[in-house]
């Protein structure tokens, strides 16, 4: 049971932040001209994140919304990090947000 808890609360957000925010932002910005379309990148990231959580239609919708929160946070903190307004890399900030979200969900589901 503890392995599942650690996996769901710590490891999954680590991998998902790397894949669905950091990698997707990086790969889409390689497309010429795409760097101007941050809103599109945020939505693409959110949709892919949501679709990867395909337990049910409602869960996909909820995961898309959370994916939007994570992607928007990643974009926001990337800009702040690049401008020197924060010393924390956006990856770790989004990972912390995701971990806190998963902790709250875990306690709600298991109370």
Model-derived regions: residue spans:
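Transmembrane helix-loop-helix hairpins at the membrane interface
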Residues: 5-111
């Amino acid at each position: 049971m503890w392995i599942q808890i650690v996996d769901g609360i710590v490891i999954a957000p680590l991998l998902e932040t790397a894949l669905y925010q950091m990698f997707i932002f990086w790969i889409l910005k390689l497309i010429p001209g795409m760097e101007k379309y941050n809103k599109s990148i945020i939505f693409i990231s959110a949709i892919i994140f949501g679709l990867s959580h395909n337990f049910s239609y409602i869960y996909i919708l909820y995961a898309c919304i959370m994916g939007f929160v994570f992607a928007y946070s990643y974009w926001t903190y990337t800009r702040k990090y690049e401008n020197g307004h924060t010393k924390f890399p956006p990856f770790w900030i989004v990972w912390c947000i995701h971990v806190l979200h998963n902790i709250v969900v875990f306690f709600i589901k298991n109370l």
